[in-house]
Amino acid sequence: MARSGFEVQKVTVEALFLREIRTRFGKFRLGYLWAILEPSAHLLILLGIFGYIMHRTMPDISFPVFLLNGLIPFFIFSSISNRSVGAIEANQGLFNYRPVKPIDTIIARALLETLIYVAVYILLMLIVWMAGEYFEITNFLQLVLTWSLLIILSCGIGLIFMVVGKTFPEMQKVLPILLKPLYFISCIMFPLHSIPKQYWSYLLWNPLVHVVELSREAVMPGYISEGVSLNYLAMFTLVTLFIGLALYRTREEAMLTS
């Protein structure tokens, strides 16, 4: 009995996922360690720089928990979108096999990055909890929905830049450049309410602001972020994914044969 298209894709993605693990980490344990060290280093540096100031301005909020719920979502977005851009070149030889499609490589990479950073998030949240910092997951559903939309958004952005970058290779260099200022305007190091309201209309166009603030709301009792919206995040994500899939559909054959 012939397998359905979904079953074929599932098997393909599983094989690509295992290949990504071997490629990403190989035989070296340091690869797994680096996944923990990178966000930990960011956390420690920002705690050292802003810890005292933020403790004075937000005395009832755990600053390590506040930071973690900004850093990890940004790392998920950055890692999935960046690694999606180079997915074709890294797996070019596999496209000789008929079942393997470029979009499968993005799904496999997104799954791996998600598992890595969810594990890192849980581990670091446990560490700060054992260190005496308080948090409580008051809205687990909101947290899951927010992060799910974040992952889909990251895939959509990666898909757009992968397709466009295949036609115009210089575009592959644009995404890393765009991510640098995003780090500073996504409310990672500061709460939205610390910004004068006249500037909110500009910041709130950025979907990562909604991701970060909604994540904090879900795990920090009493933290309410005015202005952010799960509906806006969902709409932005779906539009981005639609554009990515539309571009991919028109260029899939060209990407496979180039």
Swiss-Prot record:
GO molecular function: ABC-type transporter activity
Family matches, as PROSITE patterns: ABC_TM2
Pfam families: ABC2_membrane
Residue ranges constituting the ABC transmembrane type-2 domain according to the UniProt record: 30-251
Annotated TM spans: 33-53, 61-81, 110-130, 144-164, 175-195, 227-247
GO biological process, one term: lipopolysaccharide transport
Keyword match Transmembrane helix: yes
Entry superkingdom: Bacteria
Keywords linked to the UniProt accession: Cell inner membrane, Cell membrane, Membrane, Transmembrane, Transmembrane helix, Transport
Primary localization: membrane
GO annotations of cellular component type: ATP-binding cassette (ABC) transporter complex
Compartments in which it is found: Cell inner membrane
Membrane-related topology note: Multi-pass membrane protein
Function: KpsM and KpsT constitute a system for the transport of polysialic acid across the cytoplasmic membrane.
The family this protein is said to belong to: Belongs to the ABC-2 integral membrane protein family.
Protein name: Polysialic acid transport protein KpsM
Species this protein is from: Escherichia coli
